[in-house]
Every structure is written in structure tokens, then in C-alpha cells.
């Protein structure tokens, strides 16, 4: 399937390439280090190069279906060649008629042209409904009408050549290559043995090869016999038609050997029949190739999560499936606009989403910042292979080591177990036997525990349970509020009126004033009493001294 069309205005290709190239020049990208994340149940499964493309290059393949035999040997293979020619005409004439109907539908102007155009497409569609893709393909077929006419102008010279690959350039607006898989067979095999082979052997050889090619043609054009706009021809179908000669056209269009295998796997190289001539048995196919821009410093990193053990049950990490990193910036990558191959991503546009600080910190190696969801069921596969080793949750399954024999136990609090050839050479998990060849070095963190605060609820059933608990708490709170209201209702409202409160405040202030005055008066009286006591004591002492003096005299 192709990339999902955007609902917004598409970004122009040149602007997108410029922006992407600016991003790629920021600084070299470092892929996410999966070693500290593995023990937390987050496994980096691989990286892919990110490319941006647009389908802008086209070229034509002229398939020569009928080979030319040496003049002195034509009589030997006349019978199988005539039968093959008749079968070809019967097989491909509906295809040629459908092509001509669509191309001739543009001869009328105005609204009638549009009706004839759609009618020509629907005429070959079984359900009578023309999809947008079919209309687009038919429009491309009409645009190739002039090129098809130029090819037909050269059809005699193309049919007469004995070359298996012949570049056609006279009067054509785009590169065209004439190829003949059957001619290749005749040139490589038939001419070498014709001198030593009798007529019967020649007829048998040609007949067998032609029958095989007819089978391939039927397979290739099965869905397109009635409508060339129904389906595109895949790169595999084009190779079946042209054989190894297909590489010549791709090389001429600028597809390098380093890109060829990846582009073939992407399905971006497609073809549409644009002409069929039954007189010379020539089949014209317009090939569309993508124009690819490589973003050297951008890679997509794929993440998988493993169900880990926590004190709150089994849970899996909440991280994106695909992230991309440029310099120190890590963002989630939307691959819905991309086509994936084993090593590359081909995208019509680059769409990323920012991540929360917690997820960013988690993917940077701080596993204590990772959040987990209790959404994994008991039937989830509790193990994953990585580089010849195994990361397994040995609390969910029995990790049985066959060589050396023993049971691998997972310590309390550990999220998962990292098992390599150092601890077990042959491992049995759920009846599956794995021979381990990898090794977790010292940089891999182990014995990571998941805290309760890192586990949150995201599953529908779990959320319903938690909502039930919340509802119970709310009900209890409402009951307490009702009790409070009943107690408040018993309070005399008159005592809490505004006038009563003002009276209480005034009386309180007066009481405070009297209290302060009483305190001051008490302090004054105590001070005066102490002064009188000192005076009396002084008078007493004087009198005593005078009496002593009188006695001595």
C-alpha cells in the first residue's frame, strides 16, 4: 500500500527537501542506546535510513513479444510461432482496445470529453465504479498518448532488430528502451545450437519457451486484460516481461546498484501499459520511478516493548513505536506517509511529534522516568530475541535452560531477565528451543525494578475499575458532607445572624478593654503597696537606730 494522503495542502517537494537538508546539517545523529533500556522492557529492534521521494521520473519499455529467427530456420519454428502469435493477439487485444478507448476519449472537448473519459474507464471495470486511483492512472495514460504514437512510428524498425536491448531515442520525449526476452533466448541459446539441432528439436525448444512466456504474460496481465487503469504493473511483473534487460532502463534513469534492491522492495517502481500493436507484437509500458533524496543524518529507530513484572502486576512501557533523532532532538516519527523496506523508509513528507519530558528522559537512559501501562494480557509473548540473546519475563513463563540444564529464576523486583550464551547455551521457552549466540556486555544494565509510581492505568477495564473506586470515594465523601450538614442544621441560626455577631464582637472588645484597665490598675496598686512597705521599713530602721544610740549614752 502507498502512503496515506494528507488532508492538508501538501508541502512542495523542493521546500520539503530543503528543510530536510537543513535539518540533516545540524549535527550527526546518534541512534538511541538500547543497552540501558533492555532491562526495563524497551527493546531497540533496529534503525532504518529516512529518505524523501516523489514519483517524477518516467521512461518507456518497448517489449518485443515476437522474436526474430534466422531466415534459414524460420520454417522449423513456424508452427509454434504462429500458434504463439495467435494466442498473443487473443490475450492482449482487449488490453490494446481498452488503451485506445481511454486515449481516444480526449478527442471531444467540453463536458462530453469528461463523460467519455470516465465512461472509457468504467467500461473495463467489473463493478462499474471508477476509483480515484483508476482515474489518475487513466489520466497518466492519456498524457503518454503522444509518446506511444512516436513509438508506433518506429515499430517496424524495432520489430526488425535482432538486438535483445535497443535504446530508442528518435523523436521521443523520454527515454525508451526496446527489450525482448524471447529475442534474448533466441540469441543466447537457439543460434548456438541451431547448426547441430534438427528441425524437430528447434520447434520443440521454441515451443516450450514460448509457452512459458505466455504463462508469464497471463500472470502479469491477469487483472489488466480488460482495463489498463485497474492496477499498476509491479517491478516483479516488469522483470518477468523484460528479463534481466530491465536493469538497462533503470541504470539509464539513474538508479544506482546501491539503491536498486531497496527500491524494488519498496514497490515504488511501477509500470502502466500505454500501447499494444498486434501487427508487430510490440507492447509499450511507461515505467515510473521515484526521485529520492537521501537524508544522511536522519534515521528511524524502531522500539518494541516487553511485558515486565511490577509490584502491581504485568505492564508494558509507554513509548512510541518509531522515533527519529537529529542531534540531541528525539521526536516520534509518523510512518503513515512512508513506505518501509528492510533498510530504508521512503516518505512523501516528514511528520514528527514532540514527546513529553518524561518519555524523552526515559529514552535517553533514565529508566526511572519510564511510565508503564497495565494493558498487557497474560497471553502476551513474555520474551524477545535480540542479537542472538533473549530478554524474557521469567515470572510469566518458565525459562528452562537445556544446556547447561537448569531453571533460570528472576529475582524479586526485577522487571525482566537478560539471558545470553554466558548463562545458557540452549534455552527452552514455552516449548520453543533457542540456541543463543549473543552476549550482553557490561554496558547492559540489569536488575532494574519498576516502582509503583511508574505504573498507570490505561486499559478500558482497569480504568472502569479505578473509576468505580473513585465513585465509592465520592459517595463516602458525600455521606460525610451530609453528616456535617445535619450537624450544622442543629445550630441556632439566630445566634449566627449578623447583628448577633456584631454584638458579640462589641462585647468582646469592651471585655478586652476592661480587662486591660483592670490589669493596669492592679499593677499600679501593687507598685504603690510595695512603695509603702519600703517607707515603713525605712522608718522602723531609723527608730531602732535612735533607740540604740540613746541606750549607749
Curated annotation (Swiss-Prot):
Topology versus the membrane: Single-pass type I membrane protein; Single-pass membrane protein
PTM text: The inactive precursor F0 is glycosylated and proteolytically cleaved into F1 and F2 to be functionally active. The cleavage is mediated by cellular proteases during the transport and maturation of the polypeptide.
Chain residues carrying a lipid of type S-palmitoyl cysteine: 523
Transmembrane segments: 501-521
Site, as annotated: Cleavage: 116-117
Signal sequence segment: 1-31
Any GO CC annotation of this UniProt entry: virion membrane
Membrane topology (Cytoplasmic): 522-553
InterPro entries, per database record: Fusion_F0_Paramyxovir (IPR000776)
Subcellular location per the Swiss-Prot or TrEMBL entry: Virion membrane; Host cell membrane
Keyword vocabulary terms for this entry: Cleavage on pair of basic residues, Coiled coil, Disulfide bond, Fusion of virus membrane with host cell membrane, Fusion of virus membrane with host membrane, Glycoprotein, Host cell membrane, Host membrane, Lipoprotein, Membrane, Palmitate, Signal, Transmembrane, Transmembrane helix, Viral envelope protein, Viral penetration into host cytoplasm, Virion, Virus entry into host cell
A Pfam family matched in the record: Fusion_gly
Similarity comment: family membership: Belongs to the paramyxoviruses fusion glycoprotein family.
Its job: Class I viral fusion protein. Under the current model, the protein has at least 3 conformational states: pre-fusion native state, pre-hairpin intermediate state, and post-fusion hairpin state. During viral and plasma cell membrane fusion, the heptad repeat (HR) regions assume a trimer-of-hairpins structure, positioning the fusion peptide in close proximity to the C-terminal region of the ectodomain. The formation of this structure appears to drive apposition and subsequent fusion of viral and plasma cell membranes.
Binding partners and assembly: Homotrimer of disulfide-linked F1-F2.
Record's protein name: Fusion glycoprotein F0
Source organism of the structure: Newcastle disease virus (strain Chicken/United States(TX)/GB/48)
Lineage, uppermost ranks: Viruses, Riboviria, Orthornavirae, Negarnaviricota, Haploviricotina
Gene name of the record: F
Amino acid at each position: 500500500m502507498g502512503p496515506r494522503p494528507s488532508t492538508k495542502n501538501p508541502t512542495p517537494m523542493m521546500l520539503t527537501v530543503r528543510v530536510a537538508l537543513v535539518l540533516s546539517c545540524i549535527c550527526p545523529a546518534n541512534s538511541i542506546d538500547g543497552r540501558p533500556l533492555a532491562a526495563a522492557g524497551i527493546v531497540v529492534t533496529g534503525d532504518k535510513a529516512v529518505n524523501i521521494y516523489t514519483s517524477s521520473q518516467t521512461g518507456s519499455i518497448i517489449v518485443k513479444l515476437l522474436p526474430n529467427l534466422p531466415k534459414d530456420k524460420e520454417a522449423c519454428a513456424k508452427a509454434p510461432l504462429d500458434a504463439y502469435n495467435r494466442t498473443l493477439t487473443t490475450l492482449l487485444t482487449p488490453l490494446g482496445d481498452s488503451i485506445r478507448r481511454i486515449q481516444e476519449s480526449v478527442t471531444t472537448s467540453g463536458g462530453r470529453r469528461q463523460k467519455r473519459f470516465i465512461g472509457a474507464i468504467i467500461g473495463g471495470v467489473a463493478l462499474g465504479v471508477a476509483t480515484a486511483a483508476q482515474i489518475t492512472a487513466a489520466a497518466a495514460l492519456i498524457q503518454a498518448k503522444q509518446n506511444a504514437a512516436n513509438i508506433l512510428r518506429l515499430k517496424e524498425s524495432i520489430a526488425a532488430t535482432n538486438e535483445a536491448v535497443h535504446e530508442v531515442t528518435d523523436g521521443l520525449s523520454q527515454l525508451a528502451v526496446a527489450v525482448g526476452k524471447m529475442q534474448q533466448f533466441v540469441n543466447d541459446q537457439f543460434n548456438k545450437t541451431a547448426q547441430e539441432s534438427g528441425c524437430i528439436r528447434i520447434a520443440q525448444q521454441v515451443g516450450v519457451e514460448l509457452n512459458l512466456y505466455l504463462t508469464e504474460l497471463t500472470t502479469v496481465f491477469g487483472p489488466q486484460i480488460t482495463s489498463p487503469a485497474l492496477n499498476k504493473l509491479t517491478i516483479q511483473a516488469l522483470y518477468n516481461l523484460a528479463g534481466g534487460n530491465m536493469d538497462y532502463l533503470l541504470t539509464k534513469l539513474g538508479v544506482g546498484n546501491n539503491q536498486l534492491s531497496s527500491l524494488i522492495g519498496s514497490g515504488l517502481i511501477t509500470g502502466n501499459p500505454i500501447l499494444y500493436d498486434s501487427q508487430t507484437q510490440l507492447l509499450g509500458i511507461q515505467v515510473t520511478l521515484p526521485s529520492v533524496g537521501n537524508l544522511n543524518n536522519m534515521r528511524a529507530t524502531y522500539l518494541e516493548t516487553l511485558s515486565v513484572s511490577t509490584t502491581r502486576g504485568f505492564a508494558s512501557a509507554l513509548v512510541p513505536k518509531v522515533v527519529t533523532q537529529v542531534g540531541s532532538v528525539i521526536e516520534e516519527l509518523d510512518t503513515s506517509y512512508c513506505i518501509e523496506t528492510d533498510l530504508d523508509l521512503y516518505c512523501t513528507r516528514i511528520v514528527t511529534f514532540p514527546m513529553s519530558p518524561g518519555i524523552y528522559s526515559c529514552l535517553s537512559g533514565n529508566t526511572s522516568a519510564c511510565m508503564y501501562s497495565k494493558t498487557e494480557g497474560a497471553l502476551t509473548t513474555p520474551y524477545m530475541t535480540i542479537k542472538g540473546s533473549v530478554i524474557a519475563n521469567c515470572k510469566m513463563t518458565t525459562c528452562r535452560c537445556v544446556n547447561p540444564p537448569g531453571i533460570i529464576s528472576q529475582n524479586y523486583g526485577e522487571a525482566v531477565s537478560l539471558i545470553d550464551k554466558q548463562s545458557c547455551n540452549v534455552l527452552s521457552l514455552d516449548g520453543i528451543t533457542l540456541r543463543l549466540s549473543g552476549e550482553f556486555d557490561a554496558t547492559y544494565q540489569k536488575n532494574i525494578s519498576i516502582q509503583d509510581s511508574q505504573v498507570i492505568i490505561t486499559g478500558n477495564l482497569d480504568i472502569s475499575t479505578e473509576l468505580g473506586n473513585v465513585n465509592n470515594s465520592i459517595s463516602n465523601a458525600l455521606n460525610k458532607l451530609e453528616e456535617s450538614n445535619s450537624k450544622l442544621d442543629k445550630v441556632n441560626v439566630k445566634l449566627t445572624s449578623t447583628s448577633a455577631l456584631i454584638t458579640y464582637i462589641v462585647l468582646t472588645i469592651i471585655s478586652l478593654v476592661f480587662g486591660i484597665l483592670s490589669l493596669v490598675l492592679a499593677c499600679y496598686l501593687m507598685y504603690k503597696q510595695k512603695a509603702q512597705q519600703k517607707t515603713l521599713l525605712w522608718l522602723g530602721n531609723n527608730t531602732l537606730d535612735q533607740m540604740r544610740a540613746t541606750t549607749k549614752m
